[in-house]
Amino acid sequence: MKTLAVMSRKGGAGKTTVAVNLMLAARAMKVKAVLADADPLRSACEVLRGRDEATGTLFETSASKLFALKEACARSGADLLIIDTPAAPEQDVAEAAKVADLCLAVARPTYLDLAAAVRSVAIITQLGRDGMIVLNQCAPPRNGIEPPAVVKAFQALRFAGLPVTPTALRSRLIYQTAFAQGRSVLEIDQDGAASAEVRELFMHVWKSMTGQARAPLRSANDDLRRIDTRPSPRTALGLRA
């Protein structure tokens, strides 16, 4: 069994949206996925608890219980445990990262979200975990051209220390429509743009965790880490040291 921790150090980034949609996408692709809601806000539970299959696939938990839950899920035959992590305190975020095979930091293309992504990356790298960053709630391209804010976010995150997923999730009303019905975007419109993005993101994450046709996860800038003149992540994002 593999474990994915979906992280954000600030509210509003869409961490729960990503976690829930990835879990339901996995199940749609015949991966036996379960979700652990370790966020005290219990947003994932609010969305999913009315589903017929919620029992056995959705768990309310806390950071201190994640290791035991992971062991129980593995014994039950699950293929994938997705953790909707708390935003704080840092110790709880770290506990979630420790039990994960891969940490997925969620960030919108905004100054404060990028700053929070740097803090998430710091925890992931300090613990020696594999990780990546996904940009969420991005404005869609116009006439095939990415909005400047999205381009700048991708450029800034090149220096954050972890790779950025090639698929960004766009700001679309269907996410809220789906949540209001306790469903995923794939269940609302399986042929829509949002569904395609979620499927692509899940396959990228799943292949990364299972080692399918991928080299070990490392930042494209790994070979620059020995160079003293490389800007720090906070400097690259225009943040104070």
Where are the predicted features?
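Inter-motif core of Ras-like GTPase G domains
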Residues: 89-111
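P-loop NTP-binding site
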Residues: 216-241
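Structural beta-sheet core signal
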Residues: 35, 83, 105, 133-135
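Inter-lobe coupling/hinge region of RecA-like P-loop helicase motors
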Residues: 176-195, 199
